Amino acid sequence: MITRHAQRWWSVFKHWGNNSSTFTIDPARTGLLGLMSLFLIWLVLTKSLPYVLAPTAPELALWLAPDHPVALEVQANKARARLLELITAETVKESTTKSDESRGAEPAIGFAAPNLVTDKQSRAIERKELREKIRVLATKILVNDPLNAHAFRLLAEVEEDPDRIRSLMREAVKRSRRESVAVFWLLNDNFHRKEYKKTLDLADILLRTRPALHKYVMSYLGQIAEDTQGRALLVKRLAAQPSWRSLFFSALPRHVRLANTPLELMIALKAAGHPPSPAEQKPYLTFLLSKKLVDPAYNAWLQLLPEEELTTLGPIYNPSFESTPSGLPFDWAIGRLVNASVEFAPREDVQNGHALHISFGSGRVTFPALRQVLMLSPGRYRLTVDYRGRIIAKRGLRWRLSCLQNQHNTIAETDMLMGMQAHWRTITFDFEIPYIPQCRAQFLQLLHDARSASEQFISGEVWFDELNLNRLGD
């Protein structure tokens, strides 16, 4: 078998050898093939290979293609990095010198002074040379690649005339919205010139293309929100529901000087027909409460409520568990659960009625709390709640009321709820809100009163409905 295959291949090669003269009898075709091969090699060396070499060996790439834009850009970026290094070192040295002078340190004297001057002059010369090198390289890039946004930005960075810088930065952004340095420079420039519409346009670009820069962009948007003219433009932009709207409201409280600025912005959005969602309100209300600004937080929440809810508002919000909780401080909020579920479920015995339904799985349960912040004035009150269910546990559930700013100060609590309760019954407990600043607001919560891990085992289900809070006569 092997012998037959070998003989077959030998006959093929022998036939080719006998007919190889066909390549020599037509020198024109042979020459044409040679020229085509050389042309292809030239294309590879001057077009394809420089792209491969440019990131790691720009000098070799430029030797093959002297005007290759990618290699020129790599060299320009290296020069820029060196220039930034020199500028940073100079800034640090100047700040150190000023710090020494402020502490009363003696200036350098004697033979060291000429060396310092010479070193400073040499760094200044190097910076000047680097700027010129970047300018030349960027110009060459644009000759070969007029749409290169990065080259326009490099040119802008080595210019000194503000109008020229502004023009070049605009050209960079016009060619690519992902040229973030140019976008941010223009954002800052337009902000300081009070061109708020252009500032918002550029902020929109950055927040869409570079969300990681939101901390820096939000500082500008926060200041625009505090300007009457800027706020109107910002409201219009937010009403269009940009993708970064929730991020904006989450960061806004940390980027304003006046505590009422977010509220004024939200009220304006509400008036424009695009009110903030509960998720957008929550960071602001939580921020106010963390600063112990309880009354401003409650006032803000009231102003952002729909008109129809204000007319039926009582001391407890949503006392019959009819609407889905928003998670806001003055509404029901549910903590993270493990092996338990909480829902506002329909009641089978009441048409269109709902109740709080809690079910526990078998095993250890994490049931942090169902909670709501109340604003009760000092005095005596009575709280009632309907309850039924079956709970098997060492320690059961409690309703507890405490002072918001000192939650260890328990005002009142129910007995532990556990065992079997097949039919609805009403729980009642009286309490008194003290005249102390820490109790300006109160914290009502339903919790599993477990004191240790071994007491976290609970099973069963429970229903609650119709919380009623009434003030008693003094």
Segments (PLM) and residue ranges:
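Alpha-helical repeat scaffolds
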Residues: 58-62, 92-100, 128-140, 164-173, ...
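Alpha-helical adaptor scaffolds
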Residues: 119-127, 138-142, 149-160, 219-225
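Structural motif corresponding to the intra-repeat A-B loop/turn of tetratricopeptide repeats
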Residues: 82, 128, 159-162, 193, ...
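Extracellular and organelle-lumenal recognition/adhesion modules and their flexible linkers in secreted
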Residues: 11-18, 23-62, 66, 73, ...
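Short extracytoplasmic
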Residues: 60-92
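Alpha-solenoid helical repeat scaffolds
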Residues: 73-74, 150-154, 180-188, 201, ...
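Residue-level signature for tetratricopeptide repeat
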Residues: 78, 124, 158, 188-189, ...
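A structural motif in tetratricopeptide-repeat
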Residues: 64-68, 145, 176-179, 210-211, ...
